[in-house]
């Protein structure tokens, strides 16, 4: 997942100028006959088809399965610790009940985040954001989803600071990307980390209009829709605006093959082995 462009390409003439630029022609070059375009393999919350989501076990397995990226969900504990969990409650993926933001970090850490997936995962803990950065940066790309940032005022600054402390906000560190369904949060992240690739998530066809895509292109590098709304025309339009496109959530080989055919740049899947045939 390269940080192809953004921000510099703003205004009414964006699509036209890109269409005829050498950069655009190189970016849009199709594979020769018999070749398949390189597609990034993103392990959705880790290898969640086989291991509990947002856990070290799931992320380690994704690395073992040679995923290009792990996707993580970042929220915050009551006492201000950045933690990894998808739902805004702990009910589905732990042995506890209640809202994530109502637990202290110590309380969250005491929960069993693995047994729901299988006895062999008993005792898996909710990881911290910092642990993931320390453990996996340099081994695998990290796609950071800001989960429900509207519930955690100031979380954007906190995430940005954690990245800056580790020198991960620089353009050479291209294998870290930040995304969210909350577009205002992503505009904020773009201002806080102007060199960091930004992605927008959606499952809404209303966000695929030319006008909407042009707005996203003013601050985002990635447009990441659910695969049910992906078309070849959408992929082409996203590319013409200088963005890349990654689609989710693949849970079958048929879905992966469909997205290969559409020409997307990344496939986000619970099963990294479904995406492996990219090579």
Go through the PLM ranges and name each one.
Residues 2-279:
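Phosphate-group recognition and catalysis centered on beta-loop-alpha active-site segments
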């Amino acid at each position: 997942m390269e940080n192809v462009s953004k921000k510099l390409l703003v205004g009414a003439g964006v699509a036209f100028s890109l269409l005829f630029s050498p950069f655009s022609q190189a970016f849009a070059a199709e594979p020769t006959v018999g070749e398949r375009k390189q597609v990034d393999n993103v392990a959705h919350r880790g290898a969640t088809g086989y291991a509990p989501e947002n856990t070290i076990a799931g992320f380690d397995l994704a690395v073992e399965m040679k995923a290009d990226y792990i996707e993580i969900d970042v929220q915050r504990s009551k006492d201000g610790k950045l933690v990894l969990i998808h739902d805004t409650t702990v009910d589905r993926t732990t042995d506890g009940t209640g809202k994530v933001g109502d637990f202290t970090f110590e309380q969250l850490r005491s929960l069993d985040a693995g047994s729901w997936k299988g006895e062999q995962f008993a005792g898996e803990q909710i990881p911290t954001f910092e642990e993931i950065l320390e453990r996996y940066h340099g081994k695998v790309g990290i796609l950071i989803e800001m989960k429900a940032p509207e519930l955690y005022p100031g979380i954007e600054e906190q995430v940005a600071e954690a990245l800056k402390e580790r020198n991960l906000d620089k353009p050479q560190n291209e294998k870290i990307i930040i995304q969210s369904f909350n577009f205002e949060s992503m505009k904020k992240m773009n201002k806080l980390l102007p060199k960091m690739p930004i992605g927008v998530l959606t499952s809404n066809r209303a966000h695929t209009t030319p006008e909407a895509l042009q707005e996203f292109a003013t601050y985002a590098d990635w447009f990441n829709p659910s695969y049910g709304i992906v078309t070849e025309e959408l992929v082409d339009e996203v590319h013409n605006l200088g963005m890349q496109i990654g689609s989710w959530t693949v849970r079958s080989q048929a879905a992966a093959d469909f997205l290969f055919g559409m020409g997307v740049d990344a496939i986000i899947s619970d099963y990294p082995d479904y995406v492996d045939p990219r090579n």
